Swiss-Prot record:
Signal peptide: none annotated. One of its GO terms (molecular function) is RNA binding. NCBIfam families: nusB. Belongs to the NusB family. GO terms for cellular component: cytosol. InterPro entries: NusB-like_sf (IPR035926), NusB_fam (IPR011605), NusB_RsmB_TIM44 (IPR006027). It holds the Pfam family NusB. Keywords: RNA-binding, Transcription, Transcription antitermination, Transcription regulation. The lineage of its organism: Bacteria, Bacillati, Bacillota, Bacilli, Bacillales. This is Transcription antitermination protein NusB. One of its GO terms (biological process) is DNA-templated transcription termination. Involved in transcription antitermination. Required for transcription of ribosomal RNA (rRNA) genes. Binds specifically to the boxA antiterminator sequence of the ribosomal RNA (rrn) operons.
Length: 134
């Protein structure tokens, strides 16, 4: 499983955990195709995002412009959380790669408007709370 697919599956698992309040293990298992195994990268993204969820929500909450964390779509929230986890806690991936992958995921799930929304929120969050250079 490559990193792009790992991110996609991680967002799907995070979405499920948010919507139907399932365990991390069940959410990961349910998004995998038959015979597919979760990569360690995917598992790390999901577990790290869940572990730091409250902190990640605080990072971007002030940059939603007229929205609250609870009001944004579940998929957008999952993408923002995972992207910020990757930007702030995963040291071996360049920031621009993590940033662009989040925008592409948003476009894949919600179209151009979703991509612009994620781009705007991530940009403002990163300006306010600069992650260490990778």
């Amino acid at each position: 499983m490559n990193r792009r697919l790992s991110r996609l599956r991680a967002v799907q698992a995070l979405y499920q955990m948010d919507v139907i309040d399932t365990s991390m293990e069940k959410a990961i298992e349910s998004v995998l195709d038959e015979g597919e195994e979760a990569s360690s990268f995917m598992s790390d993204l999901v577990s790290g995002t869940v572990t730091h969820q409250e902190e990640l929500d605080r990072l971007y909450a002030d940059h939603l412009q007229g929205w609250t964390v609870d009001r944004i779509g579940n998929v957008d929230r999952a993408i923002l959380r995972m992207a910020l986890y990757e930007l702030y806690y995963v040291d071996d991936i360049p920031k621009n790669v993590s940033f662009n992958e989040a925008i592409e995921l948003a476009k894949a799930f919600g179209g151009e408007d979703a991509g612009r929304f994620i781009n705007g929120v991530l940009s403002k969050t990163m300006e306010a709370y600069k992650p260490k250079d990778k």
